[in-house]
């Protein structure tokens, strides 16, 4: 398809409108330079009076011009300045007073403005609150002492003194006497700000004299923390995690040891020496007691992991003791009574399934242990040693249990 060209159309003239403009047209400002003839017809302003002597240092531009509404005369008035103590009056009043015959003193009294004299030094400053200022406050007026020790630490602390050499360089001073200068000298050489007591002794190490009005007595006593369950029954549920000592032997407190030592020595302080061993062992006879002790130690090793009392009733085994499948020993009555409520083992918590075997070997070992303990107590009494009350009570209970059987 070919494009068709249209002939150009003539521009149409705007249609005349009869509507009036709504906004008025702003007038144009015209500036005209005044000629020499116009300047001659102007009225000259009267000369302003000279400033006072005290106000000579003020700026000459501190004047305000005002125009009198009644006469149309333009009068210059001096601007009020709070830093001057001069008496100020307008030139209009001055001219009126001279014309009316008023004296100068009356004019000053009527138009005097009293102001404070700012030339004198102020004793109090409202911005610094000097009325409540303390002696240890930081003062910013003195630039030399802004960062001094007295301003930073206050007046209540004493100034630290530094020693100087002849040349003026700082000498090696003690930690408490060195003034901080921002240099790190290590942890041991830090400055100390703790004030020392002048009455305190200068000695830092070594013995210090005790006060004469106080008497101190120190007594060290033997009181070990022994596991009560292990001592009474030979078994502890905590095992190796128990924080108490697992020991079944008898121990004595400090006062008991002292009493036993006094009974043995009978009050004698210097005891004669005794021979503890002999180098000649060829003619030494065989000691049957050592062999017996070795045999007893072997038996005790067997009974080390076996409690010598029932852990349920915490008493000696009554009737015939029984052993569970896990290897723990109980009284027959205690084991059956517990099995009615809880079928698990009282020592380890494993299931027993109602199986309790007779512990015949345990009965024989316990009898040997009782006989050996009785023999040791008898020998101790013969040597004059004291026997603990717990051993006697255990012996009596064991005899009572055997009698009941």
Curated annotation (Swiss-Prot):
Question: Does the keyword Disulfide bond feature in the UniProt annotation?
Answer: no
Q: Where is the composition biased (Low complexity)?
A: 15-29
Q: Which GO terms describe its biological process?
A: mRNA processing; snoRNA splicing
Classification via SUPFAM superfamilies = CCCH zinc finger, RING/U-box
Q: Cross-referenced Pfam families, in alphabetical order?
A: zf-CCCH (PF00642), zf-RING_5 (PF14634)
User: What ranges does the record list as Acidic residues composition bias?
Assistant: 56-70, 387-405
Q: Which InterPro entries match?
A: CWC24-like, Znf_CCCH, Znf_CCCH_sf, Znf_RING, Znf_RING/FYVE/PHD, Znf_RING_CS
Q: Where in the cell is it found?
A: Nucleus
Q: What does this protein do?
A: Involved in pre-mRNA splicing.
- Return the similarity comment: Belongs to the CWC24 family.
Q: What is this protein's record name?
A: Pre-mRNA-splicing factor cwc-24
